[in-house]
Amino acid sequence: MLFRSDPEGRPTVFDALPADMPRVVSIGRLDFNTEGLLLLTNDGALARHLELPATGWLRRYRVRAHGRVSQSDLDALPEGVTIEGVRYGGIEAAIDSVQAGNMWLTIGLREGKNREVRRILGSLALEVNRLIRVSYGPFQLMDLAPGTVEAVKRRVLADQLGPAAEQFGLTGPIDGYKARQAKLNPGARKGGDEE
């Protein structure tokens, strides 16, 4: 769960983070019944920037769904779809395999509206029973174990952001980056070089 604390007392993602980690926010969200890659940052402006569809970063999911649909049904999704008055942008979708009453699909989208994958596939009479985010832009889940935290190096993030990296203090000397981080997290521990 992505709340700092859950009203029902369930554990949250933030409960599992290392104690010495600075306060972070999620980039996007994962619904309660969704698993997989979650990016965290201590820079709220960076989080907002990366969540915007204009950034162009594709979020890719592996989906197990009950029901049947043809690839030709999925081939209409790149044009977008309107469900119950809500417009969803273009979606890439491919059937990976069919097993008993379930199908495995790979879905790619650039928006990230609440329950978007479940609603779109539901409109095709598919009931999602497992949803795993496998990538967010250039960052991939690959073999990262559940609950594992892995830092993204400053240089890697700057390369991925391209020209936008400058507005987040990622292109100048490391001292400028550290000053920006200290301003964002005044109580954070001082530590190693994030190069």
For every predicted segment, state its role.
Residues 1-195:
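Basic, flexible Lys/Arg- and Gly-enriched helix-loop patches that mediate nucleic-acid binding at interfaces
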